[in-house]
Amino acid sequence: MSKRPNFLVIVADDLGFSDLGAFGGEIATPHLDALALEGLRLTDFHTAPTCSPTRSMLLTGTDHHIAGIGTMAEALTPELEGKPGYEGYLNDRVVALPELLREAGYQTLLSGKWHLGLKLEQAPHARGFERSFSLLPGAANHYGFEPPYDETTPRILKGTPALYVEDDQFIDELPADFYSSDAF
């Protein structure tokens, strides 16, 4: 029997494929280049215009509307709220790749931004990741504290409060010097 391959999927928001050295980019990305040169490079994935719809397509292999992420949850308008395809989380009409991998005996881990649901029953552990440390919302605070805001602070500057989970538990408190890029 042949050995099954290990594989690693990296999702990087706001990074074009041509930004990486392995794809001819000018930015030095030696570690990512080494992974790309030693492995299989997928070169024909078509993205949605924003991150969570793209994430849902990558994890399910289907259209983001079928997966429940017709748009980012933060961008849902009152006209779309509650409509099929606009649930704002990875719905149960689709099977996620980590669920299939677990059934096949793979170990699965997610570290980083999830942006596919804000409740524990929508978090990575509920979609096949046996271990996870993740920031559930998109565009959230990546530090271990929430800055003070008042009513005069424009909404766009307030951002989204950080909401981290480890496996199936919300994290109530992060170290004061926490920064997500260091943790992930």
Annotate each predicted stretch with a short phrase.
Residues 1-184:
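Formylglycine-dependent sulfatase
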